[in-house]
A protein has these predicted regions:
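Blade-edge beta-strand/turn elements of extracellular beta-propeller
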Residues: 17-20, 98-108, 146-158, 225-236, ...
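Repeat-based blade/solenoid architectures
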Residues: 26-47, 84, 106-118, 157-168, ...
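Gly/Ser/Thr/Pro-enriched helix-cap/hinge segments flanking short amphipathic alpha-helices
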Residues: 34, 343-346, 378, 386-544
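Beta-propeller blade termini
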Residues: 45-55, 92, 113-127, 142, ...
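Hydrophobic beta-strand segments that make up the repeating blades of beta-propeller
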Residues: 58-65, 125-134, 180-184, 257-262, ...
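Short, conserved, GDST-rich strand-edge loop motifs in beta-rich repeat architectures
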Residues: 64-83, 184-211, 371-389
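Beta-propeller blade signature
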Residues: 86-93, 214-222, 271, 328, ...
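Asp-box/WD-like beta-propeller blade repeats and closely related beta-sheet repeat scaffolds
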Residues: 102-122, 127, 132-172, 182-209, ...
Length: 544
């Protein structure tokens, strides 16, 4: 058999992703409870988490579900689940790569109309926990370490209120305990408002401009068990319409910052001042608007160094006719709008994107893009014949900072049309190739295995914090080979309402060894030389 050649950034090599959902035993169906009254939550959910809840080395899967909605529903109602068909679902991965539904045993069915999920070990006991966002009140599930979870929301003080969407864990004050950012969409209830034409079949979901913005929630982890809501004390008082949140230290000052994708208003970039407070710098950093100075419908987001200059960049998805926004880090606290120079403008103009993550699908050392797509309005084709409610997911190959659409050649899944929403990435089978899960509104979830043929090498790290938080979230990992230097922030956040594998993954191209540097949240810098490729390497934080 002839050996496969190693890909180079200039090669337009497609991926190969295979839908293994049914073969893996995943039978989840999202129930959005669509009604003729077009209540907005019906079209917005929901998310997914890829995480290893039992520490067996294999990723498990958590899928968020809706709840019944009556037509009409009285204003002020908070929908609740009333049967197993509306349960959120936890799937445990067996030794053979198939999944078993363990929701009932684990006790993580959810309570209300679910939106998103964020996974991380908030109490540093070695087991990842789950925070589930909902319309109304959210839920914190503590992982007991025996295959079960306990609802500790009330004790922890993190129920929140309103309509929560994406959430992310981050140790913003670097005290060794993970804090929690929770986005809220807007001030909305079940008032019966007619939007769209009065013609039969033309009623539409209402535009967010009709509703008031609302502040996000920031919970400080006090002692590993209790949280305190500190958004006002932290200087986070500007109201938004938040849908996506991503974490990175974009200015290399040692403190994690975060970006909020807002819907149809300016975007927010919160700079961590290093004293427990944040400053919103979206406009001055040139990330608050698009390249033409306009707002857009920000939905999904990811913070990642796509051009391998070791500085985190930003991608934000939005609605059709707006173009996905790519911001290249200028190394001085500002960003350049790179949508045109990267090739994204022409590729994404007619598409609507939600969940998005940078991933190196072919392990050539350059971060590619995977995007879940679909319009928010199921009536969009009635007014705009060139736009579609159901869309195919999109795979874009990064060729040295320029993106090429390789979707059509990358598997049958990229020809299917879905109402895509959430997206999480992770190495499901630990073969060194990044896989993905995409959720759809009122439809199935799809497990996509990466079968891309490539001789390129790879390296994945599993960080174990000691002075830092146990998951190492917020650590900046730099991997250097003879040809490339790459950097990733350790995070489970980003995308839309979803949570990805915490283990940072690096494609190495032809290189068989790499040097690794980890800047832990504690301030400790740890270096490993000549690390052999093709492995998942566990790295425990040094004590000093």
């Amino acid at each position: 058999m002839r050996a496969l050649p190693a890909a180079t950034p200039g090669d337009h090599i497609p991926g190969r992703f295979t839908d293994i959902t049914k073969a893996a035993g995943i039978d989840f169906l999202h129930r959005a409870s669509h009604t003729p009254l077009k209540y907005l939550p019906e079209t917005m959910g929901s998310g997914v988490a890829l995480f290893d809840y039992d520490n067996d080395g294999r990723l498990d899967l958590y899928l968020v579900n809706g709840a019944p909605i009556a037509a009409p529903t009285p204003a002020g109602t908070i929908p609740g689940k009333n049967g197993p068909q509306y349960w959120n679902r936890l799937y445990h991965q067996r030794n053979d790569g198939t999944f078993e539904d363990v929701t009932g045993h684990a006790g993580v069915a959810g309570t209300g109309y679910g939106m998103g999920v964020a996974a991380a070990d908030y109490d540093n006991d070695g087991y990842q926990d789950l925070y589930v966002t909902q319309y109304g009140h959210n839920v914190l599930y503590h992982n007991n370490g025996d295959g079960t979870f306990t609802d500790v929301t009330e004790e922890a003080g993190v129920a929140g209120s309103g309509w929560s969407t994406s959430a992310a864990w981050v140790d913003y004050d670097r005290d060794g305990r993970l804090d929690l950012i929770v986005l809220r969409y807007m001030k909305w209830d079940f008032k019966n408002i007619w939007c769209g034409s009065r013609q039969p079949g033309h009623r539409a979901y209402c535009h967010p401009d009709l509703f008031e913005p609302i502040t996000l929630l920031l919970y400080h982890n006090e002692d590993g068990k209790h949280f305190r809501e500190v958004s006002r004390q932290a200087g986070i008082t500007v109201p938004g319409k938040g849908l996506g949140v991503a974490i990175a230290d974009y200015d290399h000052d040692g403190y994690p910052d975060f970006f909020v994708a807002n819907d149809s208003m300016r975007e927010f970039l919160f700079h961590n001042e290093g004293n427990g407070t944040f400053k919103e710098v979206g406009l001055e950093s040139e990330t608050g608007l698009d390249g033409d100075g306009r707002t857009y419908a920000g939905m999904g987001v990811d913070f990642c160094d796509y051009n391998n200059d070791t500085w985190p960049d930003l991608i934000v998805t939005d609605l059709s006719n707006q173009k996905y926004a790519l911001y290249s880090n200028s190394h001085d606290g500002s960003f350049n709008y790179a949508t045109y120079t990267s090739g994204l403008a022409g590729i994404t103009l007619l598409h609507s994107g939600w969940g998005v993550r940078f991933l190196d699908y072919d392990n050539d050392g350059w971060k590619d893009l995977l995007i879940a797509q679909g319009h928010v309005m199921d009536t969009i084709h009635l007014d705009f014949p060139d736009l579609y409610y159901l869309e195919s997911p999109m795979l874009l190959r990064n060729s040295g900072g320029k993106f090429t659409n390789v979707s059509k050649a990358s598997g049958a899944v990229f020809s299917e049309r879905w109402a895509g929403r959430g997206l999480a990435i992770g190495d499901i089978n630990n073969d060194g190739k990044m896989d993905a899960v995409i959720t759809t509104n009122n439809g199935p979830a799809y497990l996509l295995r990466n079968d891309t043929p490539s001789a390129n090498h790879w390296l994945t790290l599993k960080l174990v914090g000691c002075k830092s938080n146990r998951d190492g979230i917020g650590a900046a990992v730099t991997v250097k080979t003879a040809k490339l230097t790459q950097c990733r922030t350790v995070t489970t956040g980003g995308s839309y309402c979803s949570s990805s594998d915490v283990r940072p993954h690096f494609g190495l191209g032809e290189a068989t060894k790499a040097d690794v540097e980890i800047q832990w949240p504690s301030g400790i810098t740890q270096r490993l030389a000549n690390v052999t490729a093709g492995r998942i390497v566990t790295v425990t934080e040094l004590e000093k």
